Regions:
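Walker A (P-loop) phosphate-binding motif
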Residues: 99-141
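C-terminal helical cap/extension that packs against the catalytic core
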Residues: 43-55, 364-420
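Residue-level signal for inorganic ion chemistry
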Residues: 12, 24, 73, 114, ...
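Short internal beta-strands
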Residues: 31-37, 217-221, 353-354, 373-382
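N-terminal leader/targeting and accessory segments in enzymes
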Residues: 1-98, 102
Length: 451
């Protein structure tokens, strides 16, 4: 679609929506920003645009008569596709795009795209480093922090875009086609948005929707859903595994990550050379290395980059040691599966801070993973009573309830012995007490340093 002169509704007045509106204006379209919040501060929204134009801003009830004037709708990631208003767009025959689709349509060059329940940000950051070390023009975008829409007009045919893509963004893609895609894993998450696990899986798998036989999809062999999915898709499938050798793919053999192609078996790196902890991070390295290899990067360059890579903030991030107690920030552990990986990475008796916003998750597997390693479970947030009840039902009773994160850090410092670890890995979203998981992690680090 040629966007020039088109009237485009941007649904959502947050960071993503404003970024999409800025891009649309730069591409010659006429963006209209809409938000369902009747009390929206329109002046504040205007101040957040790039300042080169003055978009129309609609707030509150949607003016139904305006439907006929629209050519396209761009949904922000936080807008559910099952809203009656969104359904009316489809019924009217309007194209409905995600911001990812908009950025892809206006960008150039190759796209390497990563999705999955957990590990996306670390894998995206690592792949971004590998590609950045090997290529001239590389953009690392998406949920990792830089909006895809803010960079697409800077891209050339020689550019490489490394994109972290969420399930929310995949719901409304149309032509989005990565040269290399990866689905790292699929575990229970966002059921408050997708309602069923089957729907969540379907949306994640859309990342391969437009890939052809010359494209590549990297999948986790140890995820049964993904292993079966890989049997019936168009792109070339490359599996990774941390538990077994593969006939073809990338896998962990003892402490050595190996890549096996149709022609040869290539050592990539030893796990002891890596600066990031845990088996889940070995899987992230395998996924990023496979993607880079099939994007044309040499093994030598991949090896150098992965050895230099350090953990991104809020992912089992070492904060400090005080009185013999090590403090780790894993605020990105926003669901039980991610939080399990945080516990698995600990090699000390652990005081675990958990709880937060309820995404309708089950916490049983997370609690069962404590396996003698967790000394105390210190709970905060909306889910603290729900998690306490689940833990007691499963026989774990060393539980302390706190009003907030500051109190939880203080209690952990009082209870911890030299040689212990204090781990913030909440298994829940941050909403309600914090704006996002980054703010939660930053506050944890502040409270720890103030002890």
């Amino acid at each position: 679609m040629d966007l020039k002169g088109k009237k485009v509704l941007v649904f959502g007045a947050g960071k993503s929506g404003i970024g999409a509106a800025d891009l649309l204006e730069s591409a010659g379209a006429q963006p209209v920003i809409y938000d369902g919040n009747a009390d929206l501060d329109k002046e504040a929204v205007l101040h957040k645009t790039n300042g080169k134009y003055t978009p129309e801003i609609w707030a509150g009830d949607f003016p139904e008569r305006a439907l006929d004037s629209l050519d396209l709708v761009v949904l922000s990631p936080g807008v559910p596709t099952d809203l009656p208003l969104v359904k009316s767009f489809y019924e009217k025959g309007l194209p409905v795009w995600s911001e990812v689709e908009l950025a892809y349509r206006t960008g150039k060059g190759e796209v390497l795209a990563i999705t999955g329940t957990n590990g996306k940000t670390t894998t995206t950051a690592l792949l971004g480093k590998i590609m950045g070390d090997a290529r001239e023009s590389v953009f690392v975008v998406g949920n990792i922090g830089t909006a895809y829409t803010s960079k697409s007009l800077e891209m050339s045919e020689d550019s490489v875009t490394v994109a972290e893509i969420s399930s929310f963004q995949l719901e409304t893609i149309d032509q989005f086609r990565p040269k290399v895609s990866a689905i790292l894993n699929i575990t229970e998450d966002h059921l408050n948005r997708h309602h069923t696990m089957e729907e969540y899986i379907r949306v994640k798998e859309l990342i391969t929707k437009n890939q052809g036989p010359e494209d590549v999809c990297v999948l986790n062999y140890e995820d049964e859903v993904l292993r079966k999915f890989g049997e019936n898709i168009v792109p070339k499938v490359v599996y990774f595994s941390s538990l077994r050798k593969l006939d073809q793919g990338i896998y962990l053999d003892g402490d050595q990550i190996m890549l096996k192609t149709e022609k040869e078996e290539i050592p990539i790196v030893k796990t002891e050379e890596l600066k990031i902890l845990g088996r889940h991070n070995h899987e992230n390295v395998m996924a990023a290395a496979a993607m880079a290899y099939y994007a044309g990067v040499s093994v030598e360059s991949i090896r150098k980059s992965v050895c230099e890579f350090v953990a991104v903030p809020h992912r089992i991030e070492y904060v400090t040691e005080k009185n013999g107690v090590a403090y780790y920030n894993d605020s990105k552990g926003t669901n039980p599966d991610a939080a399990i990986k945080g516990i698995q990475a600990m090699n000390r008796p652990t005081l675990l801070i958990g709880g937060g916003y309820d995404k309708e998750s089950s916490y049983d597997e997370w609690i069962e993973s404590f396996d003698g390693k967790v000394r105390y479970l210190v709970l905060i947030g909306q889910t603290k009573e729900k998690i306490k009840a689940a833990a007691e039902r499963l026989g774990f009773t060393d539980i302390i309830l706190c009003e907030d994160l500051k109190e939880a850090v203080r209690v952990c410092a009082e209870k911890a012995n030299p040689g212990d670890a204090v781990l913030l890995s909440p298994a829940c979203a941050s909403w309600g007490q914090f704006d996002n998981y980054e703010q939660r992690g930053d506050m944890f680090k502040e409270y720890v340093k103030a002890l």
